[in-house]
């Protein structure tokens, strides 16, 4: 496997309308810790979605789904491995940035991966670390508040 593309993705006009109602640079976008191939990719690969998000978003924050070399849920780590990508927060960040250049302003990693941020390849990235495991609703609310 060399890549994974969803070719039938199509824009939802209601989403376009909602984004346009907000005005330019009036929203913050958080890309949750979802599978970049099966969850985020089909959305970001919709024609013109990237340019629309960059035009409308004040900032885009992406949360890594990889913690300590594994995905907490789902096949993201398996897909990364099959594509020959390093299964790490750093590997995810570099792949996302290559696939969706200039989309993400701030990268959020779990504190377990903080040491990876010292890589020369990542020096120009705004990487923040915190506990990203949302084990209950109260922790999820705290994390959401921290993100915003």
Tell where the protein language model's regions lie, with residue ranges.
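Internal active-site segments that recognize and position negatively charged phosphoryl groups
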Residues: 1-51
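Alpha-helix C-terminal capping/helix-to-coil transition sites in glycosyltransferase folds
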Residues: 25-26, 55, 103
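Structural motif
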Residues: 28-31, 59, 106
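Short beta-strand segments
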Residues: 32-34, 63-64, 108-110
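Short glycine-rich anion-binding loops that position phosphate/pyrophosphate groups of nucleotides
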Residues: 35-39, 66, 113
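Redox- and metal-dependent alpha/beta enzyme cores, enriched for Fe-S-associated oxidoreductases
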Residues: 42-86
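C-terminal functional extensions of proteins
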Residues: 72-148
